[in-house]
C-alpha cells in the first residue's frame, strides 16, 4: 500500500480552498450574457472552445493533491446540478465558492464549523421556499424559447428551435440532438416512441462514444414471457439472419443461454441484435407491448392467441426505420404500423383516461398517449467547423434540459435577481446560536454572488448594481446584455426555478462538507531519486599489470 500524507486543520482546509478558487475562477468567467469563452487543450485533435461551465470544470485536474481535492469537490457541485437540472452549473460553482470563502473566515476566527453548516442548511431551506413563491408556470411557446435562448448563451435561434420542437411533439414528447449536414439548424419530427427500458447487456452497444445500440431498419420481436432457452428463438433468428436485417427483442426478460447466444452472435457479426425488457408491470406491460405492436405493425407473441416463439415468422414481427437503445431508454423511430390503427389506439386510450378513477392511472394512460401520438423531434445542429459543431451541440443540450426544467417547475426572473428577491424572505431568519446566525449570513452573502459575477463579466461595478437591484422590487433587475434596468421577465431574461434551486442546494451541501473537514489524506509523492546501483569501482587504474 502506498504511503499517505496526512494534513490537519487549517493547513488542509487552506490548500483545498485554493483548489476551489482555481476551479471556480476558471468556470465563472463564462457566467452571464457577456461571459467569456474558455479554450481547452486536447491530447489529440484541435482545442475545444466552450462557454459551458460543466465542460470547463470537468477538464480541471490540479497537480497539488490537496488543491485537487478541493477542486474535485466543487466539480461534483457542477456535475450534480447538471444531472438534476441540465443547467446552472456555473451558478452552482459561484455559490459554492462564495459559501466556502465566507465560511472559512468564520472557521479561522474560531466559530464551530458544524453550527455554521446547520445555519447554512437552515438558510438554504428557507431560500428554496422563497424561490417557490416567486416562481410562475412556464406555459407559452415564447417563454419556452426565452428559457432556451438564455441557457444557450443568448442564442435566439436555438431557443426558437427547441420551442418549435416542444410545440410539435408536446411537452412530454422526445427531443433528440444530432449533427447536421449544413450550416443551418434544422428541425425534423418523425413518428416514434420512447420507453424507459435499456439494453440487457452492454455488449449490444455499437456506438461506444454515445453508449447506445443503434439498429437501422430492424425487425421487432414482441414476447410477453421470459426467454431463457435459445432453442425457442432459433427459428426466428435464422429467418432474420437470412433477411440481413437487425433484430430488437422486447420480452419480459431475456436471460441465461438465450442472452449469452445473442451477445456472442452480435459480437461476431453473425446477426446484429439487441434485447430489452418490456416496459411497465402486470396488465400495464401487456397494454404497452400492444402499443408497440400497433406502432411497429407487429403482433405480440402470446399463448393466448395461439402463438409461440417456434411458430413465429417474419410476418409476425414489427418493423421500424431506426432504433436507439441506451442504458435506460429505448427510442423507436418511424414504426411501420398503420396510421389508422395507431389513431384508433390513441382514441381508445383517451376514452380510458376519461373513465380512470385514480390520478396515477390517468397519468400513466396520458403518458401512453404522448408516446403513441407525440413522436420524436430531431434537432440537427448546423455549423461551419467541427469545433463549432461540438460547442454548439453542447449549448443545445443545455438549452433542452433547461426548457424541460422550466416546464416542470416553472420560471423565475433571471440574471441573479431571483436569489436577491429570495434574500428578503430570510433576512429575519434566526439560528439557535450565534454560530448558526453566522451560517445564515454566509448564505445571504453568497446569494448576491451570481449577480456580482454577471455584472463583473459585463465590465460594470458590481457593488453599485447589487445595491440598485436590492432597492427595486419584483421582477425588476439588471439586464447585462443591454446594460439597462427593467422588468427582466418582460425582457425574456428568465431562469428555470428547478435550475436555481438545484444550484443552491448542491453548492451548500458540498461547501458545508468542506468547511467541516479537519483532516485530508492524500497519496505521498513517490521518491524519484536514483536507485542504489553498483558501488564506485575506483576507476581502472589498478589494471595496468594485465598488459
Curated annotation (Swiss-Prot):
Function: Together with its co-chaperonin GroES, plays an essential role in assisting protein folding. The GroEL-GroES system forms a nano-cage that allows encapsulation of the non-native substrate proteins and provides a physical environment optimized to promote and accelerate protein folding.
Binding of ATP, residues: 30-33, 51, 87-91, 415, 479-481, 495
Reaction catalysed by this enzyme: ATP + H2O + a folded polypeptide = ADP + phosphate + an unfolded polypeptide
Species of provenance: Polynucleobacter necessarius subsp. necessarius (strain STIR1)
Name this polypeptide is given: Chaperonin GroEL
Cellular location(s): Cytoplasm
Gene Ontology cellular component terms for the protein in this record: cytoplasm
Cell inner membrane in keyword set: no
InterPro entries: Chaperonin_Cpn60_CS, Cpn60/GroEL, Cpn60/GroEL/TCP-1, GroEL-like_apical_dom_sf, GROEL-like_equatorial_sf, TCP-1-like_intermed_sf
Assembly and oligomerization: Forms a cylinder of 14 subunits composed of two heptameric rings stacked back-to-back. Interacts with the co-chaperonin GroES.
Gene Ontology terms for molecular function: ATP binding; ATP-dependent protein folding chaperone; isomerase activity; unfolded protein binding
Listed Pfam families: Cpn60_TCP1 (PF00118)
EC number: 5.6.1.7
Keyword annotations of the record: ATP-binding, Chaperone, Cytoplasm, Isomerase, Nucleotide-binding
GO biological process, one term: protein refolding
UniProt cross-references to HAMAP family, sorted A to Z: CH60
Keyword Membrane: no
Primary location: cytoplasm
Family membership noted in the UniProt record: Belongs to the chaperonin (HSP60) family.
Amino acid at each position: 500500500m502506498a504511503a499517505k500524507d496526512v494534513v490537519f486543520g487549517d493547513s488542509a482546509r487552506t490548500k483545498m480552498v485554493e483548489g476551489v478558487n482555481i476551479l471556480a475562477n476558471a468556470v465563472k468567467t463564462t457566467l452571464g450574457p457577456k461571459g467569456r469563452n474558455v479554450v481547452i487543450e486536447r491530447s489529440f485533435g484541435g482545442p475545444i472552445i466552450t462557454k459551458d461551465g460543466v465542460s470547463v470544470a470537468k477538464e480541471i485536474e490540479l497537480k497539488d493533491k490537496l488543491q485537487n481535492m478541493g477542486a474535485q469537490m466543487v466539480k461534483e457541485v457542477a456535475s450534480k446540478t447538471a444531472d438534476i437540472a441540465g443547467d446552472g452549473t456555473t451558478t452552482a460553482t459561484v455559490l459554492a465558492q462564495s459559501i466556502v470563502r465566507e465560511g472559512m473566515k468564520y472557521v479561522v476566527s474560531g466559530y464551530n464549523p458544524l453550527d455554521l453548516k446547520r445555519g447554512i442548511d437552515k438558510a438554504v431551506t428557507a431560500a428554496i421556499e422563497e424561490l417557490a413563491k416567486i416562481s410562475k408556470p412556464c406555459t407559452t411557446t415564447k417563454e419556452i424559447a426565452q428559457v432556451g435562448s438564455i441557457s444557450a448563451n443568448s442564442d435566439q435561434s436555438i431557443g426558437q428551435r427547441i420551442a418549435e420542437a416542444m410545440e410539435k411533439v408536446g411537452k412530454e414528447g422526445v427531443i433528440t440532438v444530432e449533427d447536421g449536414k449544413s450550416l443551418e439548424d434544422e428541425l425534423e419530427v418523425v413518428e416514434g416512441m420512447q420507453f424507459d427500458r435499456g439494453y440487457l447487456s452492454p455488449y449490444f452497444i455499437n456506438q461506444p462514444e454515445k453508449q447506445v445500440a443503434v439498429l437501422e431498419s430492424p425487425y421487432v420481436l414482441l414476447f410477453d414471457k421470459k426467454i431463457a432457452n435459445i432453442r425457442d428463438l432459433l427459428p426466428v433468428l435464422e429467418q432474420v439472419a437470412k433477411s440481413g436485417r437487425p433484430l430488437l427483442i422486447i420480452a419480459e426478460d431475456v436471460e441465461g443461454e438465450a442472452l449469452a447466444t445473442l451477445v456472442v452472435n452480435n459480437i461476431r457479426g453473425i446477426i446484429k441484435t439487441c434485447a430489452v425488457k418490456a416496459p411497465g408491470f402486470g396488465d400495464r406491460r401487456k397494454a404497452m407491448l400492444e402499443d408497440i405492436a400497433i406502432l411497429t405493425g407487429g403482433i405480440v407473441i402470446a399463448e393466448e392467441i395461439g402463438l409461440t416463439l417456434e411458430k413465429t415468422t417474419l410476418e409476425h414481427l414489427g418493423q421500424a426505420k431506426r432504433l436507439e437503445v441506451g442504458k435506460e431508454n429505448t427510442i423507436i423511430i418511424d414504426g411501420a404500423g398503420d396510421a389508422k390503427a395507431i389513431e384508433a389506439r390513441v382514441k381508445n386510450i383517451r376514452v380510458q383516461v376519461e373513465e380512470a378513477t385514480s390520478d396515477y392511472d390517468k397519468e400513466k394512460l396520458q403518458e401512453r398517449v404522448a408516446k403513441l401520438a407525440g413522436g420524436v423531434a430531431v434537432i440537427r445542429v448546423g455549423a461551419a467547423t467541427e469545433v463549432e459543431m461540438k460547442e454548439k451541440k453542447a449549448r443545445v443540450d443545455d438549452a433542452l434540459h433547461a426548457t424541460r426544467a422550466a416546464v416542470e417547475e416553472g420560471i423565475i426572473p433571471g440574471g441573479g435577481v431571483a436569489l436577491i428577491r429570495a434574500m428578503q424572505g430570510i433576512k429575519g431568519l434566526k439560528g439557535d446560536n450565534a454560530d448558526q446566525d453566522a451560517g445564515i449570513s454566509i448564505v445571504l452573502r453568497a446569494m448576491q454572488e451570481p449577480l456580482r459575477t454577471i455584472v463583473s463579466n459585463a465590465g460594470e461595478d458590481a457593488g453599485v448594481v447589487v445595491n440598485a437591484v436590492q432597492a427595486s422590487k419584483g421582477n425588476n433587475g439588471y439586464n447585462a446584455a443591454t446594460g439597462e434596468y427593467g422588468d427582466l421577465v418582460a425582457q425574456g431574461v428568465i431562469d428555470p426555478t428547478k435550475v436555481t434551486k438545484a444550484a443552491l442546494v448542491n453548492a451548500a451541501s458540498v461547501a458545508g462538507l468542506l468547511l467541516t473537514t479537519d483532516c485530508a489524506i492524500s497519496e505521498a509523492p513517490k521518491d524519484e531519486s536514483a536507485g542504489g546501483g553498483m558501488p564506485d569501482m575506483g576507476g581502472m587504474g589498478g589494471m595496468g599489470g594485465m598488459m
